[in-house]
Amino acid sequence: MNENQFNEAMQQIVDALKKRGYNPYEQLTGYVKENNPTYITRHNGARDRIQTLDFERVKQFVNSMRG
C-alpha cells in the first residue's frame, strides 16, 4: 500500500469516527495504546479497514495528529 492509499484509508477512518460523534485522536490513541479494535467504530467498515493497515504506520499517523 502506497502512502496515498494509506492516507486515504486513515481519512476514511477519521471521517467515520467523526460521523459517530467520536474524537478521532482519542479513539485512535486508545486503539494504538491498547491494540484494541473496539476503539474504532464499525461505521462504514472503519474497524475492518484499520485492522488491514500496518500497525506501525497507524502509530506514526496518530503521532502526527498531535502536531
Predicted segments, located by residue:
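Intrinsically disordered, low-complexity, basic-enriched segments
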Residues: M1-G67
